[in-house]
Amino acid sequence: MPEITLIGWFHTVIGIASILLGFYSFFSFKLLSWNKIPSRIYLVLTFITAVTALAIYNQGGFGIAHIMGILAVLAVLCGVCVERTRILGYLSTYFYTLCFTSTFLFHSLPAAADTLRRLPVDDPLADSLFDPIILYFHIAFVIIYFITLIYQFIWIKNKNL
């Protein structure tokens, strides 16, 4: 595994800060919203994290992490646009919740793969993207994502947002 570059460190630190703010926002407000300051900071940091991911090419060129970065950028932009314009009417809250919650998934999949292929430094837990431990983490994250999304949709429906 190549060493982490300066942009890689910046990307990692911003990404960790983003995730921490995202969890805080989720547990405080039940869903992310551009109208809540912690959520807004999360979304800006997520956008920066995703854009910096597009500049990291030390692992063999354009890959799945870059696709996740593009999806995260699109999710943030679409979610903010729909939340601010309410263009989808009553479905707007569901749509921006889908977009913003999806950014957690787009963070976690490449982060888990990269972390498991780097740590511990002397003997990483995984050798490749297709290592079973990475696949298990990815399956767990997808399950958590769908449970969280269903919970949020039920909460939105019950609150008539």
Task: Give the label of every model feature segment.
Residues M1-L161:
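Alpha-helical membrane insertion/targeting regions
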